[in-house]
Amino acid sequence: MKIFGIIMETNPLHNGHSYFIKKIKEIYQPDVLIAITSTSFTMRGDISVIDKFTKTDQLLDAGIDIILELPFTLALQSADYFAKNAIEILNGIKITDLVFGSEIDNYEFYDKCLNIINNFNNYDNKFSKKQ
């Protein structure tokens, strides 16, 4: 059984989100598509333009099968912790695949960014020393 998880920050749901959900279903044909999303507050701490109940209805209408709420205390984090917390919850319910969108379709770019993050102390020391 293919159980796909997706982390969604919809404030509100727009055509890009709907297109992404549609493409996931067309291309991968998961048996279940589960979304985890923030509450009535966004990751940035803003009040969402729609409440979590309307957000849930919109996601169901867009084709999501199950919607999980990322608890407020886990959602109000930097993007990396927001994602980490959401992934931990999705892993806890045994998803088989995690799908996500990207504004840049160049894997090498993300690989280089990850390398910089993983080696930040080396970069920090290199650039912080006086020449």
Predicted regions span which residues?
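Nucleotidyltransferase catalytic core that binds NTPs
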Residues: M1-Q131
